[in-house]
Amino acid sequence: MKMHFCIPVSQQRPDALGGRYVLYSVYLDGFLFCKVRYSQLHRWDEQLRRVFGNCLPPFPPKYYLAMTTAMAEERRDQLERYLQNVTADPRVTRSDVFTEFLTLVQLHTLNITIQNVELAVFLPDGRSIKVEGLTSDTAERVLEVMAHKLGLQPDLVGYFGLFLIQCFPEGKLSVVKKLADFELPYTSLQSSEMENCKIGLRKWYLDPALDSMLMDCRAAGDLLYMQAVQDIEKEWMKPTQAQREELKALQKKENQTKFLELSQEVRHYGYVQLDPCTCNHPEPGCGAQLSIGNNEISCCITLPNGQIQDIAFQMSRVKCWQVTFLGTLLDTDGPQRTLNQNLELRFQYSEDSCQQWFVIYTKQAFFLSSCLKKMISERMTKLTEQSPEMQIEVPEQGRSKKHPSQPSQQKVYFNFLRKGKMKRSEGDYVWDTLMEEGL
């Protein structure tokens, strides 16, 4: 699946020969990922094509004369789409030529040299494990080391991930983003403009039924237990009073197996809870508390008059969604490392032959989108296992073309836009090329 790459900022810089070049600020999941020149990306594309041939998406052509403003904007859009599409092929993202280039540009952007470093990775129970390595170690590498230290079976590592987590004095926490395999945890911490951020290990699946795949591994069971205890403490899970008392009794007895079995019956077990946000349903300006998991978006909505409504949106009825950056980046020579100030995620929902757009205004819009993609991916996997020949129609990411090496037949429906690209149409927003087929 494609990733949330965007290039909202580009700057003209003088070069050593007196000319000028364009430096593109590449963001991933709303955070500054790297700053690169067109020439660097062009050489990288040539290296990738030597390995993967013409199955790669088209790369923006060179211009030998000065570009007009329209041409410069078109190139930026093309580079953005290229990054989104090239990361959709797991063969590419697992390759050395892919990872090595992105490692270097991440380090270069923050002027970080490759050196020994000790990285603290926090477990759900608050303990941290020191991982000795290099500043250039990827999230995939750090996760492998963590798995070895914890005794986690290699075939279960994919059920977990490293996350950027923000902690607050009152004990609350906010999951900011899930680190991609090729991201560098050390640079992610250095580039974050948020206070009290740390790298945390959490399970990365949203179908509670997948717990059964992990229970034969003691280390995996320990991690699930830690996270369930934490989710109750943070009130992400919603046990009844009777369930809470029984869970406390099982916790005192250190009966992890029974604890996790009972947790499966608790409302919102295995869900991810977002920070309080606002939405437009059932009327503009409503407060919302979102929990995502088990193929649904669960919303606890506070109306302006103080009334509470609980609504659950089933993922099977979500037709498409859109993340939009509504703000304007000023002072482009400054750090500008996050796009979390003015974000919205809107999704189209079909119910009773009626389709309606719902809008959520949250700084975690990219992480919310990642969770929606994860639920779609898990549903696809389950359906494929049940019927390998089934053609699956799912909402996900758009603007890509089908290649012979990627036989997956999906309809893909995710997109990211900046405010300047939005159009008005009869009181609502529409987007260019919102829905396209294929990967």
UniProtKB/Swiss-Prot annotation:
Its subunit composition reads: Interacts with CCDC22, CCDC93, VPS26C and VPS35L, associates with the retriever and CCC complexes.
> Gene of origin?
Snx31
Instruction: Report the SUPFAM superfamilies cross-referenced here.
Output: PX domain
Pfam families registered for this protein in UniProt: PX, SNX17-27-31_F1_FERM, SNX17-31_F2_FERM, SNX17_FERM_C
Recall the GO molecular function terms of this protein's record.
phosphatidylinositol binding
Please give the residue ranges the record annotates as the region Disordered: 384-409
| SMART domains linked | PX (SM00312)
Q: What is this protein called?
A: Sorting nexin-31
Q: What processes does the entry annotate via GO biological process terms?
A: protein transport
Q: Where is the PX domain?
A: 1-109
Q: Does the keyword Protein transport apply?
A: yes
* Keyword annotations of the record: Protein transport, Transport
GO CC terms in record? protein-containing complex
By sequence similarity, the record places it as follows: Belongs to the sorting nexin family.
Q: What does this protein do?
A: May be involved in protein trafficking.
